[in-house]
C-alpha cells in the first residue's frame, strides 16, 4: 500500500524502533545515507511522542495535510540534509 501511495517500488517504513523494508535490500538501504537519515528521524519521533501517540499524530497530520505536508515527513526530509 505504501509503495502505491508513494509511487515507489522500494519502501521503508518505521514502526517504533524497527525499520521495515519492502523491495529493497538491507545493503542498498544502508548505503543510501539520505534515506537512512530520514528513517532514523522517524525512529526518534516515535521515541519522543510514544508509540501509539505518534501513530495517532502521524495519521491525523496525513489526513489534514496529506503525506507530503505532514510535519513529521517535513522534519524527516530536513533530516536527510544533515
Language model features: what each stretch is:
Residues 11-12, 18-36:
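Short pre-active-site segment immediately N-terminal to the catalytic Zn-binding motif
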Residues 30, 37-39, 59-61:
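Generic alpha-helical propensity signal that fires on short helical segments
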Residues 1-21, 49-82:
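Metalloprotease/metallohydrolase-associated module, dominated by Zn2+-dependent proteases
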Residues 34-46, 76:
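Active-site recognition of the HExxH zinc-binding catalytic motif
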Amino acid at each position: 500500500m505504501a509503495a502505491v501511495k508513494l509511487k515507489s517500488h522500494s519502501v521503508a517504513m518505521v514502526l517504533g524502533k524497527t525499520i521495515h523494508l519492502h523491495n529493497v535490500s538491507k545493503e542498498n538501504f544502508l548505503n543510501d545515507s539520505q534515506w537512512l537519515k530520514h528513517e532514523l528521524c522517524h525512529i526518534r519521533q516515535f521515541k519522543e511522542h510514544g508509540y501509539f501517540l505518534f501513530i495517532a499524530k502521524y495519521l491525523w497530520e496525513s489526513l489534514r495535510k496529506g503525506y507530503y505536508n505532514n510535519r513529521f515527513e517535513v522534519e524527516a526530509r530536513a533530516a536527510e540534509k544533515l
